[in-house]
């Protein structure tokens, strides 16, 4: 969702550098970029309690965001995709990391190789069988059997809810 809000960011982590002279002040002021300030604050060593105190954002939500930071740190401890375990790669995808974000975490400051590294992450991920499944939204809350055209992709599943046609791409 964060990639779609038009802030020029890639998600909660692995973004361009956000320059903030006063993180406390930026956390206290609700803006359209505060979610990225929270990421920067976690990276700067702020605790969930400190961020909660400054933002009044629910600790449950902050804990979920902190887990994304922990995953980013685990990825950054690796220098190439082959060092990333299947479990870590799957966890990153479930948490919403794009292949680009994973590549950027592995590259650290060598940003000139991002396109090549992103493709390598994608190829390696697919080779390992870490691919999304198609799920169908149940618009009738399971009261009645419903066939809808409301579909989404997720890494949090094991099988597709729909059958593909013969070409393997069309539903």
Which residue stretches match the model-derived regions?
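ATP-dependent carboxylate/acyl-activation modules
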Residues: 1-171
């Amino acid at each position: 969702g964060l990639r779609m809000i038009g802030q020029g960011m890639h998600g909660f982590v692995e973004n361009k550098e956000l320059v903030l002279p006063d993180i406390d002040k930026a956390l206290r002021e609700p803006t359209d970029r505060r979610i990225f300030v929270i990421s920067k604050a976690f990276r700067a060593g702020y605790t969930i309690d400190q961020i909660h105190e400054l933002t009044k954002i629910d600790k449950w939500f902050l804990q979920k965001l902190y887990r994304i930071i922990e995953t980013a740190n685990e990825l950054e401890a690796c220098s190439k995709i082959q060092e990333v375990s299947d479990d870590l790669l799957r966890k990153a995808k479930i948490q919403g990391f794009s292949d680009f974000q994973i590549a950027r975490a592995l590259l650290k400051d060598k940003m000139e190789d991002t396109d090549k590294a992103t493709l390598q992450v994608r190829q390696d991920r697919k080779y390992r069988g870490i691919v999304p499944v198609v799920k169908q939204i149940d618009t009738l809350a399971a009261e009645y059997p419903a066939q809808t055209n409301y579909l989404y992709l997720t890494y949090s599943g094991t099988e597709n809810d729909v059958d593909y046609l013969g070409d393997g791409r069309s539903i």
